[in-house]
Amino acid sequence: MYYNKQAIKATVGHGSVTVKDFSAGINGNKDEENLSLGECAFSYNFNMQGGTLKDGNGVKKSNFGNSPVFSEAGVKPERLYFYKRYNKDAKAYDEYLLIYASDKEIYAAKSTEEQFKKVDGLYFYTPPYACSYNYMGDDVMIFSSDEKMKVYDGTTVTTVENVPSVTSMCIHSERLFATEGGTKTSLWFSDDFNPLNWKVSLDEAGFIDIREGVGSLLKAVSFKDYVYVFANYGIVRVSAYGDQTEFSVDGIAASSGKICADSIAVCGDRVIYLAEDGFYSFSGSSPQRIMRKIDGKIAGVDNSDAKGCYFNGNYYCKLKMQSDCGVRDVLIKYDIHRGTFAVSSELDINDFVVADGEKACELLFLINGKAQPAMLSDRAENFSVPLDKHWLSGKTDLGTTETKRVTRLSLRTLTEIYVTVKSERGSRLLHFFGSNERQSRAVGLKGDLFTVSIDCRTPGATVSALKIEYEY
């Protein structure tokens, strides 16, 4: 008996996945294997808000006055301050930038000047806190640290004697309120209408001892008719109007994680801050968690030196985050109305301040190694030098648990980019050029789980419609 022999062909399945929308952004709370393809394990210097990968924020030369230069040889700028005072003779405001530098001196530049110059007498061993106050009809800048308090009026410096060791301060109801660095449990307040008088008496200055089980006091802020005192592990509300005999501590909100002092910023109708376990928004009652998707990226990272501020509807915070290549210094931009955030990196920020001038309001930065303050740019750049932009997917099985072979990857990009496809069996680097047309590249990589990373250095990034084709 004879049989016809026929070749037995293996059945090959085909499939594809597409990322049409990148706006899901970073999700550090899920294991990478559980991320959807539209989410990413990490990203920086890309703006994903509209669903397309575009340039995020960078910094550029500021337009503050004559863009003054700090040129003191061998001295590094460390802190940045803004000060404005009404010039009665000119009937206009004089505006200044001030820098605390590594030589412990403070340097000032008026907006009409081109160089920072040392201010004689403004010397502090540690970076001071500062706030503006209209004292006896004159706009002055009060500087204070854990060693001394000094007042600068744009020309002269006055040292204030017999003041507490200040670790933060704010103006409330015409008094200066300050947390104290000695016992770290005292909230001091100056005489009303006189922030230079700290003599303790029933009708002058005084202090409130706060021992509520919240740890050391970190920062005092004036918010919604109260002074809120942020401590290591909680927030204390102080009613402080009228006669000091009527001052009272009348509310406490606990924090499960240690609060980072300089991250605290009043943002309109809320205060936003960073604690060890993540970011919080506080509107006067119970703190609420925000930006939960990055909790996993900051867990276990020391952010005791994080700093935050509020500018133009956004909360900005300089901090450290875990990335796919270790711990990174980043700048978070959080839109308080939309609840969205973006991450910038490779800026090397020393400090920043909101310069609330009469003609313009800008967020200004001290960038390490740069002689001039910077301002925000809508391009991913550092003083005209393009920044690397990076997006990394989670680990995906592309919708099937079987071993598969990625055959092609296609997308749209208006600029040059590099795409890396990885599996447990290897990797492929794909090069795409800027074009108005959809582009496709062969991959030829087997595996069970895959990651895709997109890297771009060219300004004006626009990446969309990522499609991965495979067979199994």
Segments (PLM) and residue ranges:
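Beta-sheet repeat architectures centered on beta-propellers
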Residues: 1-117, 124-128, 132-135, 255-259, ...
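Short, basic/low-complexity N-terminal boundary segments at the transition from targeting/disordered tails
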Residues: 147-148, 250, 333
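Hydrophobic or amphipathic alpha-helical targeting/insertion segments
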Residues: 132-160
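Short glycine/proline-enriched coil/turn segments at helix->beta-strand junctions
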Residues: 154, 225, 414-416
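Short strand-coil-strand connectors
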Residues: 103, 145-146, 154, 181, ...
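Beta-propeller and closely related beta-pinwheel folds
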Residues: 68-76, 122-125, 157-306
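Conserved structural-core and active-site-/substrate-pathway-adjacent residues in large, well-folded domains
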Residues: 80, 140-141, 176, 235, ...
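Residue-level signature of beta-propeller blades and closely related beta-rich strand-turn architectures
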Residues: 86, 146-147, 182, 233, ...
